[in-house]
Amino acid sequence: MNFEKFTTKLQEALNEAQSLAVAKDNAYIEPVHLLYALVKQQDGAIAPLFTTLNVSTQTLINELELILNQLPQVTGTTTQASQQLIRLLNQTAKLAQQFNDSFISSELFLLAALDDHGSLGKLFKAFGLTKENVTQAISQMRGGESVNNQNAEQTRQALQKYTIDLTERAKTGKLDPVIGRDEEIRRTVQVLQRRTKNNPVLIGEPGVGKTAIVEGLAQRIVNGEVPEGLKNKRVLSLDMGALIAGAKYRGEFEERLKAVLNELAKEEGQVILFIDEIHTMVGAGKTDGAMDAGNLLKPSLARGELHCVGATTLDEYRQYIEKDAALERRFQKVLVDEPSVEDTIAILRGLKERYEIHHHVQITDPAIVAAATLSHRYISDRQLPDKAIDLIDEAASSLRMEIDSKPEPLDKLERRIIQLKLERQALQKEKDEASRQRLAKLDEEMTAKAQEYSALEEVWKAEKSALLGTQHLKTELENARIAMDQAKRADNFEKMSELQYGTIPALEKQLQDAIKREEENNDHHLLRTKVTEEEIAEVLSKATGIPITKMMEGEKEKLLRMEQVLHSRVIGQNEAVEAVANAILRSRAGLADPNKPIGSFLFLGPTGVGKTELSKTLANFLFDDENAIVRIDMSEFMEKHSVSRLVGAPPGYVGYEQGGYLTEAVRRRPYSVVLLDEVEKAHPDVFNILLQVLDDGRLTDGQGRTVDFRNTVVIMTSNLGAHLIQENAEITYLAMKEMVMSVVSQHFRPEFINRIDETVVFHPLDQQHIRAIANIQLQRLIRRLAERGYQVTISDTALDHISQAGFDSLFGARPLKRAIQQELENPLAQQILSGKLLPNNPVIIDYQDNHIIAKQ
């Protein structure tokens, strides 16, 4: 017998049957071995055939295993095919000729095995299999095709293997409801109704709901809410992963796709094929000289044999499909825009129930409104409704996590009880009177805590069971509604009326009663079961770092103390501190323009007066981290070409993928202080890109992405006009500001200066300011020494000397650091290393005989 004439699947099954016979020490490979291998085979033809014949494959496998275990076992012999198996295979070859097959397939072996006179024949009789019903099932499975290649079995029932039936999922209620999008669905239906080129392609940004539109179409078809031409059609989604997975050899992928297209052609327009991410079809399966999937689709699309709905993003459509003009002309574009905030709220209200059932929590309407509005305002790089749905989902998930875990009061009590038990064990070993008294007190506390714990646990369990009861009713009600829809479609009026007038009203009443009871006993002091706008804001704050949550009393107090905190570190610059503090207060009170940065400032003044220090102090105040500052030294951007480093190199240049210094930093940390240091040293062209940041709070980077600057504080520092400030230190602040601004307006363009919220001129520092700064810096030194065990106090005379030594009206506070190093740190370091100063002893630093001394 020529084994080359067997299909691939039958050859694999024969090899498997031989392995099985060897494993079970059987001398011969019997027909039962082969049938067992065929039934267990993945993607084989036999298992689906038995399903068609209403025979349980699991029952059949169990029966076959019983027969296999009864076969005689022999050791030390070579396994060979039995006469009975050879006879059946010959019979199968004859049947293949009768069916006009070029290759011998697995299902014909089943037909031949019906003539078996042994245990297999008896088994088939027990299952009620006859030649007539098996032949009929084979014809149904083959769909009128003969076996003309070795892989014929793999390409059968291609639609079942490589597609997902969306209409079936809509019937069983597995698809989420689709709210709105009527215009897009109507346009899609309009294109599908055409005679030729009836293939719409949905194009839109990621997350706007392209796939949801097709799901909405499937739901409308199921409910009969479509024109006559689309009624009773099926919407199948092509599973590209299943189509490509396991296609090892050249041509196998094309074979599978061709099988799908052939089956679709046989359906004669009764199937609408949905290809999500349709751009993946262009180039899919393309190897040297092979056709890609896109070219295989073209003839079917042009002839109208294939009703296809595609979905892809704008960028990918341009990149892949527009390049192939022949493929593009076969599709009709349907643009899917981002829904408005109002439409998003409607969509979320429709989805609310599904998410409530999944997470077992209640989602309030203010939470839905907050999710739509806050995500629209604060998440700029993604689209509605996807980003709003994500917020609802995550907020509900975090609440569900809290419900499932032990509440904090219970957890604290449990830990305290464990702590008391450990203490009790230790005290039991002691015999003295004090320990006994302590033990008695401990027992009293333990009893009280245990009672408190059990009472709280009862409350928690009662709350949890009430919550689970409500959720169970919601799930039952949802299932009853799905069952009613199915009964309506099947014209089962008896079941429909039973559900509509009996089951559903009863469940609704039970649910209302349960919710009413919950509200009456509304003392949920352990479990939070409602998603409110606060939970939404909390999730968004964690994701973006922008403080959106309602301000707690502590934060309000902190903000009102803001000027005081800034003054404690930035000395002698009242106007600057006030301007910055007011900008932050306006923003957190919700009064600032939402389309501009929180504040944009130009700090002018001589070197070393606190311009950069104020920026650092602000970052430290807002984020408790001095490094939460995007600092860019503008002296690095002196050449014209270096401007691109801020926003990223243009396409075609090295470093295009890396993004810009400024844009990438703000994308990663949208709520931050942006410090552009020494701004006058940058090339004038740099200020052109800052115009849109200061005006609209946005900047487009080299890759075309819009970066949101609306939650940043933009601070620019400059030394322009510093000489005027030094020379005219005695005149009024306003007069000095006017003089400095005349110099600034000569250097910067009017449109740049006009966009800055406030230009702040810093005063030169006098002796008193330097003394206060010296005190701050010396306190830092004292803290560093305290960490090493030295308790240091500095006398007023020493402080006066250091502040005088570090005072220079031209250079501000910077010489002070050098003075502290030379006058104090250097001699201190020598004395510590030489052992003259010992830790854990008080150290007094004083000024005597024209130099600073440290004594213990």
UniProtKB/Swiss-Prot annotation:
InterPro entries recorded: AAA+_ATPase, ATPase_AAA_core, Chaperonin_ClpB, Clp_ATPase_C, Clp_N_dom_sf, Clp_R_dom, ClpA/B, ClpA/B_CS1
Residue ranges that the Swiss-Prot or TrEMBL entry lists as coiled coil: 389-523
Region described as Repeat 1: 6-71
Amino acids binding ATP 1: 204-211
Region (Linker): 339-545
Binding locations of ATP 2: 605-612
Presence of the UniProt keyword Transcription regulation in the record: no
GO BP terms: cellular response to heat; protein refolding
Keyword Glycosyltransferase: no
Keywords on record: ATP-binding, Chaperone, Coiled coil, Cytoplasm, Nucleotide-binding, Repeat, Stress response
NBD2: annotated span: 555-764
Pfam families according to UniProt: AAA (PF00004), AAA_2 (PF07724), AAA_lid_9 (PF17871), Clp_N (PF02861), ClpB_D2-small (PF10431)
Location in or out of the cell: Cytoplasm
Cellular-component GO terms for this entry: cytoplasm
Domain Clp R, residue spans: 3-144
Repeat 2 as annotated region, ranges: 82-144
Gene3D superfamilies: 1.10.8.60, Clp, N-terminal domain, P-loop containing nucleotide triphosphate hydrolases
Positions of region (C-terminal): 765-856
Domain comment (free text): The Clp repeat (R) domain probably functions as a substrate-discriminating domain, recruiting aggregated proteins to the ClpB hexamer and/or stabilizing bound proteins. The NBD2 domain is responsible for oligomerization, whereas the NBD1 domain stabilizes the hexamer probably in an ATP-dependent manner. The movement of the coiled-coil domain is essential for ClpB ability to rescue proteins from an aggregated state, probably by pulling apart large aggregated proteins, which are bound between the coiled-coils motifs of adjacent ClpB subunits in the functional hexamer.
Subunit structure: Homohexamer. The oligomerization is ATP-dependent.
Family indicated by similarity: Belongs to the ClpA/ClpB family.
PANTHER family: ATP-DEPENDENT CLP PROTEASE, HEAT SHOCK PROTEIN 104
Job of this protein: Part of a stress-induced multi-chaperone system, it is involved in the recovery of the cell from heat-induced damage, in cooperation with DnaK, DnaJ and GrpE. Acts before DnaK, in the processing of protein aggregates. Protein binding stimulates the ATPase activity; ATP hydrolysis unfolds the denatured protein aggregates, which probably helps expose new hydrophobic binding sites on the surface of ClpB-bound aggregates, contributing to the solubilization and refolding of denatured protein aggregates by DnaK.
Protein name per its UniProtKB record: Chaperone protein ClpB
Species assigned in the record: Haemophilus ducreyi (strain 35000HP / ATCC 700724)
Protein's gene: clpB
